[in-house]
Amino acid sequence: LLIPVILLWTRGDLKAYEGQIFETESSYNYIQVVRWGDCNYLLLNEGQAFHSFYCDGGRVDNISVWSIMLSAPYFSADPTIDNAAVIGLAAGTIPKQFTRVFGAIPIDGIELDPAIVQAGRDYFALTDPNINVIVGDGRYELNQLDGQYDVITIDAYKVPYIPWHLTTREFF
């Protein structure tokens, strides 16, 4: 009876995916980084979705949910942007793509989980000097920042839920 329990207890990674190069648990998430081809992907909790990706050299081959965010400035009469904010930074995919397309504009990125930020630095090249990483709750931290932004993206969720306090009228 104890043999199956011992085998399960000593089997290694909690939810190992093929190509897994990192895993940890934080106060907020179970975090995995997997490498497929020349790209790293961030998986959280049940692994139902990618929360960030980074390909060697910053290459972006495909249109993704993150690259769609790049269209935001074009909903304005003047599509030039001088700065941006990202609520739900994760490992930095959105600000890295904004930097690649619009140049090294100042970007404030807010992420609740410091372990995800560290994974971003270690596995997703989240080291750009124009990206100001802020660890904290998106609603609170955005209210603490001084100034206005040309673009604010919100990509804070735990699949499949959006944090309720980021959906209130007070937030917007």
Question: What does each model-identified segment do?
Answer:
Residues E25, D61-V65, T167:
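Soluble or luminal CAZymes and related metallo-dependent hydrolases
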Residues G47-S52, Y157-P160:
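A short, flexible beta-alpha/helix-coil linker loop
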Residues N40, A49-H51, V133, E141:
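A broad, structure-centric signal for solvent-exposed, well-ordered loop/edge residues
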Residues Y54-M69:
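Conserved SAM-binding loop and adjacent beta-strand
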Residues V5-T10, A16-Q20, R59-N62, N83-A85, ...:
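Short linear motifs at secondary-structure transitions and domain/linker junctions
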Residues S67-F172:
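The AdoMet/dcAdoMet-binding core of the Class I SAM-like
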Residues L44-A49, D56-R59:
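Short Gly/aromatic-enriched secondary-structure transition segments
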Residues L2-G47:
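Basic, ligand-binding patches in group-transfer machinery
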